[in-house]
């Protein structure tokens, strides 16, 4: 029996056969880069999103994102709030691991850039609204980490200590 047996519920591609929608394209358009399977398990994307109300990674409910254009030092991001009544807040991180420094943002509705100067950009978008953002960034300017906007990854868990080695020498032979 092999991993590609179509009758095996644990087959490698069973999720593709059961779901009429492939999520890879959606993730690429939302994050602004290829999926992790193309780069040794690491996401090389322009953005990552956090829901500040739920304190979790990902887009808030009823909020959509589309990375419309990518250039060497900037990207154009479109956010759409499909909720008819509620304003939505989102935290946009530069890169999957916060490795990109967001320098400034120019919303289509403004004539002057807003200086950011960090890896996070806080955005609030009204009900039934679309917001177009031109975001300038310095790529790979920050040390990558698993930090979230509300918790440092290093402080979240205890670090693993190495084993203590016995320094007693072992003599082999005479």
Role assignments for model-derived ranges:
Residues 76-78, 89-91, 122, 132-134:
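Beta-strand secondary-structure signal
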Residues 32, 40, 116-117, 172:
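Feature targets compositionally biased, intrinsically disordered low-complexity regions
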Residues 83-98:
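Surface-exposed beta-strand/loop patches in extracellular or lumenal glycoproteins
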Residues 65-69, 112-114, 123:
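Short, exposed beta-strand/loop patches in secreted or surface proteins that constitute
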Residues 1-76, 82-84, 133:
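Catalytic domains of carbohydrate-active enzymes that cleave complex glycans
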Residues 106-118:
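Short beta-strand and strand-turn-strand segments in soluble, beta-rich domains
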Residues 96-109:
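Short aromatic-acidic-glycine turn motif
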Residues 117-173:
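C-terminal beta-strand-rich structural cap/linker in extracellular carbohydrate-active enzymes
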């Amino acid at each position: 029996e092999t991993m590609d047996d179509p009758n095996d519920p644990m087959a490698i591609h069973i999720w593709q056969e059961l779901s009429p929608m492939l999520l890879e394209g959606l993730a690429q358009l939302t994050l602004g880069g290829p999926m992790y399977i193309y780069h040794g398990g690491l996401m090389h994307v322009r953005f990552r999103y956090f829901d500040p109300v739920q304190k979790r990674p990902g887009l808030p409910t009823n909020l959509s994102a589309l990375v419309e254009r990518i250039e060497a030092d900037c990207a154009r991001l479109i956010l759409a709030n499909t909720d008819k009544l509620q304003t939505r807040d989102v935290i946009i991180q530069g890169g999957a691991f916060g490795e990109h420094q967001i320098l400034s943002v120019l919303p289509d509705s403004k004539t002057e850039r807003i200086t950011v100067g960090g890896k996070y950009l806080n955005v609030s978008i009204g009900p039934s609204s679309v917001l177009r953002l031109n975001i300038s960034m310095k790529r790979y300017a920050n040390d990558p980490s698993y930090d979230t906007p509300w918790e440092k990854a290093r402080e979240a868990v205890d670090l693993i200590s190495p084993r203590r080695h016995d320094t007693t020498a072992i003599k082999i032979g005479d």
